[in-house]
């Protein structure tokens, strides 16, 4: 969904990847993912598009909060400088060739003249294009990953090629510095056959299923244990399979409370525990699971007493920076065993699942503008309810769109940098899925 960092921004100054024998009707795809160290980072992967020798890896958002897959076409323009909808404004830049794809240079490409337009973050980002391309996508593994090849390639994947974007950002008259913008997005939300403009395609996951490259409409994401330093977090994404070594305890099914017209996976709000104090959120909302968002948003009604209770119960460890949560100390000083714990009710009566997210995983390099240098600004805010990349770093999220199943487990247990483990891999044939309680 790529939620805009409105509050935070104001403060900022396969072919198969394993050599394993499985029955012939079973197929799966493994994609390495990362949560880079950076204030606006989301869950991403590195992809080379096409077969041109001059192709460069491009860091693309893997977004459970949107449905469509796109990349920049060569010569694309990004416009900004106006706060008004569909007004390109006075400023623009050309997307560098190193982060664009030119199908004319790839012997494996096939293009079609199809128009596309995608809207993100409450109409603050609009991208447009008039070309689709089918080509080979090569996903680059982490150089420290174990039990995987260095790359995995999938042929004949369809993407929209975008040639322009409008960012609703005011400018100070200089058009400098240029804003950050997405280099590409692979939407991962469920495929819904409809004419809705929110789900117009191409659908990465549905196209893989339709081509029988995977036999089940499952997706599982995980992150490994965090490194000792504040840096990139590594993980993986499996389509059509699960790696049972990536979580502790059972996968617990939770209710997917998505409503008609919504895109993505929605769950009921959890209870939130910090410093031994459990709080029951008071905002009337459901919560979006959105790997394409840089932060988590806690469902405390901003004008109620609950935000103050949250900060007061932290024992002085957390401070309120205009709705953004800060740690009262340097980022490096955050204890490694200090967690935010989210307790979700299960789909089955009496079942619950607790997800521990290390507070250090929220420290992604955001800086206060004119604030206290002794405060570490976190990718964590109060109001609304979205669980973005930080939440994903502490959870295993498993979905089966065929059955409407959404399940959670405790993640962050496998070795930093590790890929999928062949010995713990379960690949799904037709009609199969993961175990859950």
Where in the sequence are the language-model features?
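Solvent-exposed loop/turn segments at secondary-structure junctions
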Residues: 64-69, 75-78, 166-167, 192-193, ...
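Pepsin-like aspartyl protease folds
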Residues: 18-57, 118-131, 168, 245-283, ...
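Aspartyl protease catalytic domain
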Residues: 18-39, 143, 147-280, 284
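Fungal secretory targeting signals
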Residues: 1-25, 437
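Short hydrophobic beta-strand that contains or immediately precedes a catalytic carboxylate
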Residues: 47-49, 55-63, 69-71, 186, ...
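Signature of the N-terminal lobe/flap region of pepsin-like aspartyl proteases
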Residues: 38-172, 341
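Active-site beta-strand/loop microenvironment that shapes enzyme catalytic pockets
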Residues: 64, 281-309
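Aspartic protease catalytic domain
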Residues: 339-437
């Amino acid at each position: 969904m790529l939620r805009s960092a409105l509050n935070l921004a104001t403060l900022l100054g396969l072919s198969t990847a394993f050599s394993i024998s499985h029955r012939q009707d079973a197929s799966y795809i493994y994609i390495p993912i990362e949560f880079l160290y950076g204030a606006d980072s989301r869950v991403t992967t590195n992809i080379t598009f096409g077969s041109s020798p001059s192709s460069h890896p491009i860091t693309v958002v893997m977004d459970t909060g949107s449905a469509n897959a796109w990349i920049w076409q060569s010569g694309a323009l990004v416009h900004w400088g106006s706060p008004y909808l569909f007004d390109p404004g006075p400023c623009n830049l050309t997307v560098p060739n190193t982060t664009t794809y030119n199908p004319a240079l790839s012997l494996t490409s096939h293009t079609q003249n199809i128009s596309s337009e995608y809207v993100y973050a409450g109409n603050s980002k609009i991208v447009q294009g008039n070309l689709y391309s089918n080509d080979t996508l090569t996903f680059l593994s982490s150089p420290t990953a174990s039990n995987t090849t260095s790359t995995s390639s999938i042929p004949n994947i369809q993407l929209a090629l975008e040639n322009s974007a409008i960012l609703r950002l005011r400018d100070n008259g200089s058009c400098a510095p240029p804003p950050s913008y997405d280099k590409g997005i692979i939407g991962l939300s469920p495929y819904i056959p409809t004419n809705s403009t929110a789900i117009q395609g191409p659908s990465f996951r549905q196209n893989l299923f339709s081509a029988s490259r995977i036999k089940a409409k499952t997706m599982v994401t995980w992150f490994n244990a965090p490194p000792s330093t504040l840096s990139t977090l590594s993980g993986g994404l499996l389509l059509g399979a699960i790696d049972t070594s990536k979580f502790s305890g059972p996968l617990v099914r939770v209710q997917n409370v998505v409503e008609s017209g919504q895109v993505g996976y929605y769950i009921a709000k959890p209870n939130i525990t910090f410093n031994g104090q459990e709080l029951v959120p008071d905002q009337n909302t459901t919560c979006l699971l959105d790997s394409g968002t840089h932060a988590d948003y806690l469902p405390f009604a901003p004008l109620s007493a609950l935000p103050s209770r949250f900060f007061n119960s932290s024992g002085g460890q957390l401070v309120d920076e205009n709705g953004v949560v800060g740690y009262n100390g340097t980022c490096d000083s955050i204890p490694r065993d200090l967690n935010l714990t989210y307790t979700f009710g299960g789909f089955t009566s009496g079942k619950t699942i607790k997800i521990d997210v290390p507070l250090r995983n929220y420290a992604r390099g955001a800086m206060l503008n004119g604030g206290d240098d002794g405060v570490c600004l976190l990718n964590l805010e109060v109001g609304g309810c979205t669980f973005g990349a930080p939440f994903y770093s502490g959870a295993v999220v498993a979905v089966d769109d065929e059955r409407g199943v959404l399940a959670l487990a405790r993640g962050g247990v496998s070795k930093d940098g590790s890929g999928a483990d062949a010995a713990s891999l379960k690949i799904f044939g037709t009609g199969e899925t993961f175990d859950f309680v």
